[in-house]
């Protein structure tokens, strides 16, 4: 993993990756809707545990609605994150996620699984580091929790978002921020929290090397944007959540 051996590297670096491939997410959605896994066939049934889905950068819970609905259908108590649009300061986004975790924990009387796409997975890791007593596991889908290595367009969008939300904090949305959330990324995940990192080597948004965990990693085919619409990912989730 070269520079991604451990910890969270603060520098944002533009990488040359095939952003144009992301349009193929429409094909992935079509394939998912016709796949037996979307109807719950050929996979283990859920055990009623709480699962929270967390959208990626610039996205809302509408983007993960297919996944949330599917999790409910196969036997889990699935909750949207409650973040609204994920384009705010990461510390403030976390503060909106935490009540959802508290609610899911209370309603099911058990630890919660967090499934985060891209930046949503980064938030999941922060939440699990800070509150391991309430988190059973995290599943990250193309989440660059080792450092922001992304297509130049994504970095420009990040810069634009930062200029609007934290003009008084120039390092917001970067690894140089001194907020508690970024500090949590530099801390090892508590051993009692399981972590499954799912990634694709044809990611057109972030460098897939930045998405690898220390233990369980699963490579899938497809796009970054399409990870929440991937039948292959859904099968992995059904097995992992058991």
Regions found by a protein language model. Give the residues of each.
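C-terminal catalytic-base region of ester-bond hydrolases, centering on the histidine
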Residues: 189-242
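Serine-dependent carboxylesterase/thioesterase catalytic core
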Residues: 50-62, 66, 72-189
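Generic detector of well-ordered alpha-helical segments enriched in charged/polar residues
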Residues: 24, 30, 155, 183-186, ...
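Short hydrophobic "helix-edge" motifs at membrane interfaces and signal-peptide entry regions
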Residues: 45-46, 133, 192-194
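Surface-exposed loop/turn and secondary-structure junction residues enriched for glycine/proline
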Residues: 29-35, 41, 60, 86, ...
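Alpha/beta hydrolase fold serine-hydrolase catalytic domain that processes acyl esters and thioesters
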Residues: 2-9, 18-21, 159, 168, ...
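Flexible, membrane-associating and regulatory peripheral segments of lipid-active enzymes
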Residues: 1-52, 59-70, 74, 81, ...
């Amino acid at each position: 993993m070269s520079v991604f051996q451990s910890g969270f590297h603060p520098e944002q670096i533009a990488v040359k990756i095939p952003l144009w491939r992301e349009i193929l997410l429409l094909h992935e959605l079509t394939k998912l809707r016709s796949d037996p896994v979307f109807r719950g066939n050929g996979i283990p049934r859920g055990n009623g545990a709480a699962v929270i889905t967390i959208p990626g950068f610039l996205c809302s819970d509408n983007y993960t609605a297919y996944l949330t609905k599917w999790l409910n259908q196969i036997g889990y108590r699935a909750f949207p994150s409650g973040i609204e649009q994920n384009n705010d300061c990461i510390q403030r986004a976390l503060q909106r996620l935490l009540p959802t975790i508290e609610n899911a924990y209370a309603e099911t009387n058990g630890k919660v699984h967090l499934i985060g796409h891209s930046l949503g997975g980064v938030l999941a890791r922060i939440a699990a580091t800070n509150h391991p007593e309430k988190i059973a596991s995290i599943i990250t889908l193309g989440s660059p929790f080792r450092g922001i290595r992304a297509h130049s367009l994504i970095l420009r969008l990040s810069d634009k978002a930062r200029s609007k939300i934290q003009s008084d904090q120039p390092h917001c949305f970067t690894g140089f921020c001194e907020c508690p959330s970024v500090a949590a990324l530099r801390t090892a995940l508590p051993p009692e929290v399981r972590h499954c990192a799912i990634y694709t080597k044809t990611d057109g948004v972030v460098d897939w090397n930045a998405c690898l965990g220390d233990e369980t990693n699963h490579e899938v085919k497809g796009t970054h944007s399409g990870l929440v619409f991937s039948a292959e990912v859904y099968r992995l989730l059904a097995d992992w959540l058991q």
